[in-house]
From Swiss-Prot:
Region (Disordered): 352-371
Pathway: Amino-acid biosynthesis; L-leucine biosynthesis; L-leucine from 3-methyl-2-oxobutanoate: step 3/4
Name of the molecule in the record: 3-isopropylmalate dehydrogenase
Biological process (GO), any one: L-leucine biosynthetic process
Subunit structure: Homodimer.
Binding site residues for Mg(2+): D237, D262, D266
Cofactor: Mg(2+); Mn(2+)
Organism: Yarrowia lipolytica (strain CLIB 122 / E 150) (Yeast)
Amino acid sequence: MEPETKKTKTDSKKIVLLGGDFCGPEVIAEAVKVLKSVAEASGTEFVFEDRLIGGAAIEKEGEPITDATLDICRKADSIMLGAVGGAANTVWTTPDGRTDVRPEQGLLKLRKDLNLYANLRPCQLLSPKLADLSPIRNVEGTDFIIVRELVGGIYFGERKEDDGSGVASDTETYSVPEVERIARMAAFLALQHNPPLPVWSLDKANVLASSRLWRKTVTRVLKDEFPQLELNHQLIDSAAMILIKQPSKMNGIIITTNMFGDIISDEASVIPGSLGLLPSASLASLPDTNEAFGLYEPCHGSAPDLGKQKVNPIATILSAAMMLKFSLNMKPAGDAVEAAVKESVEAGITTADIGGSSSTSEVGDLLPTRSRSCSRRSKSFLRRIDGRSKLTRLRVGLPAGSASV
């Protein structure tokens, strides 16, 4: 029996929990189980604070997100969000009786006010056995990350509602600095792999002036600053066709505008077999120190049509794994959580959407144990590799602690 290791508190991280609406609080609760397990194993303290957003905030606080909640989010190390909104006909009523406030306004305000400019959505098969659940053929081997610009473009441009004239308009606007920073985010992510991943930039440069600026700026940034990276430009309509016909052809990092990213990421969401498997991260800076401020949430909605304990928590748990890696400087823990999720999927410990019979909480209950197991195996492997590395260094006359290139 191994001697018990007494852990001491080495750090404290504040995480704001925005459960949101319908299934949102349920899936957040399962991610918290995993995060508490990580904290216990690592000696890190996670301080959680629950706040309201979306319809829940409208009904209790009169607006989809309050200034007080925004201020608390700004001061946190990271944010986890469940889901916002409900069915199209859901009516949200403020304490003073108004029904004209929409839950989604809270999420848009959160993204804009906290400058969460880069939305990352990984898309891959967690297990080959899930391929048959996808409505698309040829999904095996698919592995890409969509990087969507999140605080610019048509969603935040000048808007003119129909005033009775029968005319309405929305304006798509992008500036060079906005495009530069999202291009650098894509390049950074591509360079985290060996060899570096190709970058795909999606636009509509044959029609839109904003897309021509987008293409010109992305080309310049990657050519001047990241010449080692492969850059491919693709028109958005052509890219949409490729993702249906042969999604693995676009493996790598996909970068695109706010509206195009919104559409293409929803299209890509059918590839893994269920929306309940897709995590996301929205970052305010490059995660070059693994401490970027971010908002982490599943790609699925609030599922108002499903009953309690039926929603797949994996997307939210994988979002927590992304948070560990990008915002909390705990990459090994994030890797262990991802490995545990894949093991659970392989073992069939899943919700009904991907062929299992487990409830939301049953999936969440099992993952902390699997995460600890994956973490121990990873540490053991790294110790073996480190030992071999030191032996090799001694044989070739290098100091055991020196770096090699």
